[in-house]
Amino acid sequence: RNAEKALLDLVNNTADLDLLTIVGCPLVSGSQLINAAVAFQRGEILGVVPKSYLPSYKEFQEERWFTASSHLQQSMITIGNREVPLDCYLIFEYDEVRVGIEICEDLWVPIPPSSELAMQGANLIFNLSASNELIGKHAYLRSLICQQSARCIAGYVYASSGFGESS
């Protein structure tokens, strides 16, 4: 619940900004913990995008903690005292930009959520990540992002932890 409180503080403290903001945040939906991206603007939470694909190989064991979007029991989530949409295929409009969101591993699967988002009209995809560093991974990831951007005919913004980040 501390994450939700911090999220609400951030939403309230940026209410004067006409800026679509997207942050990563663990949230509870019913009895399920989700790894999510939250989109908000002008003090209003617009929607929550849960991570679709949870890796369970090597050092990644996310299924131990989180619930994948396909296993969620609800399509709305209560944050503070307000219910907002909870779905991996939400599109947020900001001027002429139609924004879709996916989280880390979602990009690495054969048919990423961004493919469906692009078919629904998204022209800018954001990917929130906390990916680790491995030899050769950066070049592969860069290629993957460029290919997905081209397939989707959309801009692709990938934001991850910085080099050397260990937390």
Listing of model-derived features with the role each one plays in the protein:
Residues 1-167:
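Enzyme catalytic cores with a strong preference for nitrogen-chemistry domains
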